């Protein structure tokens, strides 16, 4: 009797708690992400002129980057969308993409990167 009560309690707790890593898994599991088409991330910032680069990062060529501000609040919605997204065109840094002139962003943060500076590409060394 104690064993079945314990099993019922565990099943009840499991039903009441939902870990985000289970909710965010794509259909077919984690590895199925590789088979999906990558879409452009949500627009954000003033006038929707930026793109989300992480859950609290909004960047645009005309805007620069907003990190952890009200302009980046919309980027939290990406966590609830089932398909992966990608912003920026050129890869940079360690798993990042060029977000604005001279700025490389990944979902974890942003840093200055000369590879993302369009003027540096045309300068002579």
UniProtKB/Swiss-Prot annotation:
Query: What is its quaternary makeup?
Result: Interacts with oxytocin receptor (Ki=1.5 nM). Interacts with vasopressin V1aR/AVPR1A (Ki=37 nM), V1bR/AVPR1B (Ki=222 nM), and V2R/AVPR2 receptors (Ki=823 nM).
Q: Tell me its family.
A: Belongs to the vasopressin/oxytocin family.
Annotated PANTHER family: NEUROPHYSIN (PTHR11681), OXYTOCIN-NEUROPHYSIN 1 (PTHR11681:SF2)
Q: Which GO terms describe its cellular component?
A: extracellular space; secretory granule
For the modification Glycine amide, which residues carry it? 28
Record-given protein name: Oxytocin-neurophysin 1
Signal sequence bounds: 1-19
Q: Does the keyword Membrane apply?
A: no
Q: Which SMART domains match?
A: NH (SM00003)
Q: Which organism is it from?
A: Ovis aries (Sheep)
Instruction: Kindly list the cysteine pairs connected by disulfide bridges.
Output: 20-25, 41-85, 44-58, 52-75, 59-65, 92-104, 98-116, 105-110
Q: Which SUPFAM superfamilies match?
A: Neurophysin II
The entry's function note states:
Neurophysin 1 specifically binds oxytocin.
**Listed GO MF terms:** neurohypophyseal hormone activity; oxytocin receptor binding; V1A vasopressin receptor binding
Swiss-Prot/TrEMBL keywords? Amidation, Cleavage on pair of basic residues, Disulfide bond, Hormone, Signal
GO biological process terms, semicolon-separated: positive regulation of cold-induced thermogenesis; response to external biotic stimulus; response to food; response to mechanical stimulus
């Amino acid at each position: 009797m104690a064993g079945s009560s314990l099993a019922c309690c565990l099943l009840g707790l499991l039903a009441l708690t939902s870990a985000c890593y289970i909710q965010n898994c794509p259909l077919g599991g984690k590895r199925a992400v590789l088979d999906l088409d990558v879409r452009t991330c949500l627009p954000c910032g003033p006038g929707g002129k930026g793109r989300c680069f992480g859950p609290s990062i909004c960047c645009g060529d005309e805007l620069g980057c907003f990190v952890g501000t009200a302009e980046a609040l919309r980027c939290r919605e990406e966590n609830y969308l089932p398909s992966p997204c990608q912003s920026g065109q050129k890869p940079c840094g360690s798993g990042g993409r060029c977000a604005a002139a001279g700025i490389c962003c990944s979902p974890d943060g942003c840093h200055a990167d000369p590879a993302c500076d369009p003027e540096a590409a045309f300068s002579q060394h």
